[in-house]
């Protein structure tokens, strides 16, 4: 597991700015001398940086059937990078990390994010790693939307995109389901307007209902 602090400001679509942020990521396979064999994996809504192999808890990565020696995303050939997006709860800067200014969890004060914000953050990591072009950007569902956004925002940085189970926009039904899930979590008595982490609480009943 790798941890990189991005020190350049990231201006978000909502108008707010992250003056700096951290990104957690894992790598598989070796980066070649020309740095031209890098593949980016973009995770779905509840995914994270752990894409292949077993983590410290013995859990297989979500792409374990596809990433590895001799597998479709062959790590004998490719250098695979899988990150946890900002705003997630798996280590990258987000509601579950500490906002150093007040010294508390970001919680509900963390800015709203859009797909383009994740892609811009990923591009900043790409620059830190001195990778000029992705051989491929791959993602499913919400990750597929990120792969699509890469092709729109940075077409010269992507040789190919693999977009799985993703569309250009959500249907009204999908938006409605997500809103029901959101309200289920917010209705939990432990949600506390999103500040539950600073109070040592977990809205587990609302989350169970939402999922």
Locate predicted features.
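Residue-level signal for well-ordered alpha-helical scaffold segments within enzymatic catalytic domains
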Residues: 65, 85, 124-128, 149
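Catalytic-loop region of hydrolases
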Residues: 1-38, 55
């Amino acid at each position: 597991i790798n941890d990189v602090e991005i020190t350049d400001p990231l201006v978000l679509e909502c108008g707010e700015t992250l003056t700096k942020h951290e990104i957690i990521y894992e790598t598989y396979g070796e980066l070649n001398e020309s740095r031209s064999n890098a593949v980016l994996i973009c995770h779905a809504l509840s995914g994270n940086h752990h894409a292949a192999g077993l983590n410290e808890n013995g859990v297989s990565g979500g792409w374990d059937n596809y990433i590895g020696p001799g597998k479709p995303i062959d790590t004998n050939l490719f250098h695979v990078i899988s990150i946890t997006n900002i705003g997630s709860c798996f280590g990258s800067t987000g509601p579950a990390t500490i906002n150093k200014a007040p010294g508390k969890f970001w919680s509900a004060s963390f800015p709203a994010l859009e797909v383009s914000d994740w892609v811009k953050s990923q591009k900043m990591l790409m620059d830190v790693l001195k990778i000029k072009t992705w051989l491929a950007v791959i993602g499913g569902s919400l990750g597929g939307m990120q792969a699509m956004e890469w092709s729109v925002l940075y077409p010269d940085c992507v040789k190919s995109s693999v977009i799985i189970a993703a569309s250009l926009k959500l249907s009204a039904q999908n938006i409605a389901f997500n809103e029901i899930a959101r309200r289920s979590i917010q209705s939990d008595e432990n949600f506390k307007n999103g500040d539950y982490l600073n109070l040592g609480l977990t809205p587990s009943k609302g989350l169970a209902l939402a999922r």
